[in-house]
Amino acid sequence: MLSFNNTTSASSFQSASSRYLMSSSSSIGPPQQQSAKLFPEHFYPSGLSPRQSEALERLRPNTASRERNIPIQFTGKNPTTNSALEEYKPVPHVQVTSPKSSIVPNFVSEQRGLQPQPTSQAPTNYRQFVAAPRSPRGYGDYPEMTGKASAAGDSEPVQIPIKTQTPITQARAQETKIPTIVSPHPVYYYDNQEQPIQQIREEQPNATMETKVTGQGQPKRVGRWTLAQLRQTDGIIPSQAGWNKGDSQKLMTNFGTPRNTNTRVKSENLQEIPEDIANRTHGEVRLQSGTNKYCSQRGMTGFGSGRDVCREGVRVAQNPADLAELPEEKIRMSEGIVRLQAGTNKYDSQKGMTGFGTGRRETTKMVDSKHPEYDHEKPDQSEIPLQSGTNKFASQKGMTGFGTARRETTKMVDSNHPDYSHECSIDQTTIPSQMGSNQYASQKGMTGFGQPRWEVLDPSISWQNRKSQGMVRLQSGTNRFASQAGMIGFGTCRNTTFEAEGGELPYEAMKVSETIIPSQAGWNKGDSQKKMTSFGAPRDVKGKHLKRIWELEYPEEAEISLDRL
């Protein structure tokens, strides 16, 4: 973005412009006679692009309409004769014909200035076509304030063509060239014959460069460089690396499929690498490992399924058609060796296996030298040894409850009770004599968690007696008819409490079994935590203790009797 501070006084610009006289009618002469430059060389650029020139033109605070076309005029007398032609050696001077003097220096653009350029194919209104559109009317540019006619309807300035009918010799063509200025930056040309700069100028908004796409026929630019110039500096790949400029993975559906294009370096400014040198960078596969050049996972749906083809090679990234056929001995070298102690699941499948842990239809055949009577042609090869039971025909069909026993359970043989018949027993889960039986026990109606059964186990009952009897010992009470119905609070006491049989006890005997509270602590019999909102709020134990002492001293004023304390 280009911007200028227009608040600088006009007098400073006028004094500065007189110091920058580099090419004018009064300063034509040898380069040694030109005035010295005030700033270093890098402050004077050697050329501007059309966009930059248009942005500089828009910075002029003109009161009239700003011009877009800059006619070129030659200052000096025109030669009439051949003798005068030889003596006439002027330097062309670029003069901007604008109605107002400009603080922006006149310049020679890089398209038509410093070097003789061929005839441009751009349209005549190239600068209007490339640069930004016309700027709006300047601040205060109104006929009522300036007293001048508005320039909005004025026509464009007439471009004065350069007459070329006069025969120009080769010497004249060399003399009329604009002298080349060897400088990496644009050079400004100031004209000292312009009108005096207006002393009073109003503040103008800063101009902003707008980027436009150039027309056809002109090279596209990125900054001050063309795309053709930028492409000359494309990344050069060294000889030790390959080039994948034209490679493609189109139609490569398998993971890790090698490319069929060999890696080569192709560049205009690099010498082509021989094939033997380029192949040195290819990864070499040692003889102890195979190659998966022709392997495919097509149709391999199971995880970890082995491939049926295994090859080995020396190089990779070669055309498969160039490889010679390998003998079967080499192909079989890298196959997995299966030991004798392990089976094979080559043709196994889990198709249709919906249950977790469901056995396969085809299982590994086990050869047991200790049990030669095993027949491996049986449908189910999962033979279970004699020391454990079998769940071959067991089923959980219809088992909706968690932990529900199966219909078919393991038959237990008890050597201590040979009279027990497994064929006559309804329930095969026979419990030995050291334990009770829960054969007829039921949890029907037990909705509470941890609620005891109606029949409590009694170890003293013989195992033949299948009836469960709830025998309660003397040291504990019974909760047979206890119920938690209506108990909605956590830890709520039951409505059935212990009762002592034998009638009323004396007052002294009742006090013996009560909780004895030491003297340093109070009594919390009737205490309540109502309105206790804060965590850890202490109880009013001290107040209770003082109240009790007062009631002991003044029993006539106590609210309750001392016997009820």
Curated annotation (Swiss-Prot):
Expressed in the body wall muscles. Isoform a: Expression in the pharynx, anal depressor muscle, uterine muscle, vulva and unidentified neurons in the head and the ventral region. Isoform b: Expression in the body wall muscles, spermatheca, vulva and in the myoepithelial sheath. GO terms for biological process: actin filament bundle assembly; actin filament organization; actomyosin structure organization; myosin filament assembly; negative regulation of muscle filament sliding. Pfam families: Calponin. Residues 54-69, 369-381 have a biased composition (Basic and acidic residues). It comes from the Eukaryota. It is found in: Cytoplasm, Myofibril, Sarcomere, I band. The keyword Repeat applies. Residues 1-83, 237-262, 369-400 are annotated as: Disordered. Keywords: Actin-binding, Cytoplasm, Muscle protein, Repeat. Disruption phenotype: Defects in the structure and function of body wall muscle, resulting in variable paralysis. Disorganization of the A- and I-bands of the myofilament lattice and accumulation of thin filaments in body wall muscles in adult animals. More densely aligned myosin filaments indicating higher contractility of the actomyosin network. Excessive contraction of the myoepithelial sheath. Calponin-like repeats lie at residues 237-262, 285-310, 338-363, 384-409, 431-456, 472-497, 517-542. Residues 1-27 have a biased composition (Low complexity). One of its GO terms (cellular component) is actin cytoskeleton. GO terms for molecular function: actin filament binding; cytoskeletal motor inhibitor activity; myosin binding. Coiled coil: none annotated. The keyword tRNA-binding does not apply. Monomer. Interacts with F-actin. Interacts with myosin. Calponin-like repeats 1-3 are required for actin binding and acting bundling activity. Belongs to the calponin family. PANTHER family: CALPONIN, PROTEIN UNC-87. This is Protein unc-87. It comes from Caenorhabditis elegans. The lineage of its organism: Eukaryota, Metazoa, Ecdysozoa, Nematoda, Chromadorea.
